[in-house]
Amino acid sequence: MRVDAILSNLNLDANIYELESNYQGNILHVMREDALAYSFGGNKVRIAIELFEDLKRKNCDCIISYGGRGSNLNRVIANMAFNQRIPCYVIVSETEGDQFFESINDKMVRLSHAKVINCKKKDVLKTVVQVFEMCNQK
């Protein structure tokens, strides 16, 4: 599924609701990012769409994401990359105790066939540079 197909299937405005009550005469609206019908929703879907549109504009063929084991953005990017058949590398910074922790987002990243690269927090920059150079060689 291409980014265009994802965008055409998502109504990003459909999740704005007018509240029944008002505040001091003001009509209030809420945006339900969690109701976006892609990768369990959230504002990270909007961010990922922008990233993939930028990736497309620049003719890139690989995406790198960074975050912790519970990262919503990693989940959405890995899922979107899988749907578009784009190689995805997810750099996960580990803190003490993380090796015993696996979040739902972590599982979903792995199910999306993203290449997960674990590193210590102090090595994030070095790891990002290494993965970037590896992607540029392909």
Could you describe each region identified by the protein language model?
Residues 1-138:
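PLP-dependent amino-acid enzyme catalytic core
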